[in-house]
Amino acid sequence: MNSAKLQGWIDELHGTSRQQWWLRLVTVLAPLGALFAVTAEVGTWWPFGLVVVTVLACASAIQPDSHTALVAIAVCAAHWLITVDRVDTPWLPAASVCLLAYHAVNALAATFPTGGKVPTATLVRWLRRTMFGASVTVGMWLLVVLLDRRDAPGNGLL
């Protein structure tokens, strides 16, 4: 690595706005929240996955416009699908909302330069849309839980 490139990274680090620091912090913590939801449901940690997801989350916080966020979401979702066998657990919407927040915040951080601030109108719009997505996610989970717990007699026509 040449010194000019390193100096560019240092200048970018120093020029990062406070708002971008908060966005990057959420980018690191949200997928860890999804892993915590899996741990809370299953009762055991996945140490290797914790390291992998932490590294991927940190990489996506540093470069939010890269594909590392996709890989982190895929690892978290695959871990959930492999280890959890219940659809009626309240940890499912918690993990889903964590991954939704991760995606939304990472995309928002990638939209603006590191030294820039997100305009309030844009921030409110993104927050409103993310909250709508989260509420639809939780609503769909509630519908699945209600249908899963329903005791309906068999029907040959269905």
Regions found by a protein language model. Name each.
Residues A40-P47, I62-S66, T83-T89:
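Transmembrane helix interruption/hinge and helix-loop junction motifs
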Residues V52-I62, A78-T83, V97-A107:
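Alpha-helical transmembrane segments and their membrane-interface exit regions
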Residues A74-V87, V124-S135:
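Small-residue-rich segments of transmembrane alpha-helices in multi-pass membrane proteins
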Residues A59, V118-T122:
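Membrane-interface helix-boundary motifs at transmembrane edges
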